[in-house]
């Protein structure tokens, strides 16, 4: 094998992802390759956000499959039919992003969690959530600072910022409810061997 740079790996990973979803942003490939927390823009690239990464996440799987292109189309339709509301949500999201970047730097779990829940409310307004997602978010509320859809929406998983003081109880109770779930930490290294 020849040694590949991280940028080469990202290019190859994006090409592979495009076989499934032609308009992939490349964000997932980039964060997996570089690790940590990043700010990502499809045209502008990425910038690492320095954070102590001192938190635990819970991933819950709804078991519902979805098609990213269908969900993206729903967002596009919402935007075209609700231009003012969509613009307002984008402006709110810009403020939210600024606040959460600072919260990541400070490792402020309460602000990060509140921001995740706020973002979920915006996704609800756009229409890419569903009853199963809402049920999971309500269920994890007692164990997390906040939670939201991860990925395209319309199914798939949610991600919750865990309160580690009751993580064991959270995992037991979520599994009793027959949810596939697991806890994770953020890997700050990313890809280190290929």
Residue map of PLM features:
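Conserved glycine-rich beta-strand-loop-beta hairpin in the small C-terminal domain of fold type I
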Residues: 156
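C-terminal nucleotide
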Residues: 1-6, 11-23, 29-148, 159-194
